């Protein structure tokens, strides 16, 4: 039995339960058809202004049917090209070992990309770099 009066509370993006990890994807964890049948959908955001703005922007594109690619969405939001290539590392569905080439790109991002978003993502990028050095 489907109940449309149910509100969905999504903790996918929250960072308080695992402070080393930032989850981010093109809302791959949601079924749009299921979501459309619900009364409300709440996103428990990160508390980081630029990251939350990116998540809300991403959600808007998700609701509109992903009319642009994830890469284009990230470019629109001025993410570093190396970070765009590595964005899959933030999707918890991907349990990947970080390669040497990916770790080199992470180091470049940390050294060369300057953005308010980078300031918020620095601890998560640093954690990925440490994972890649193991």
Where do the protein language model's features map onto the residues?
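Catalytic-core regions of glycoside hydrolase
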Residues: 1-61
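C-terminal functional modules
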Residues: 63-134
């Amino acid at each position: 039995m489907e109940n449309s009066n149910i509100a969905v509370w999504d903790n996918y993006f929250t960072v308080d339960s695992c402070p080393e990890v930032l989850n981010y994807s093109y809302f791959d964890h949601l079924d749009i058809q299921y979501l459309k049948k619900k009364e409300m959908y709440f996103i428990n955001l990160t508390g980081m202004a630029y990251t939350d703005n990116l998540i809300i922007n991403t959600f808007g594109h998700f609701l509109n049917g992903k009319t642009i690619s994830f890469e284009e969405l990230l470019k629109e939001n001025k993410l570093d090209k190396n970070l765009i290539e590595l964005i899959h590392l933030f999707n918890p569905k991907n349990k990947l070992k970080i390669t040497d080439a990916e770790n080199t790109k992470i180091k470049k991002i940390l050294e060369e990309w300057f953005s308010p978003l980078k300031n918020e993502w620095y601890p998560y990028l640093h954690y990925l770099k440490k994972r890649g050095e193991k």
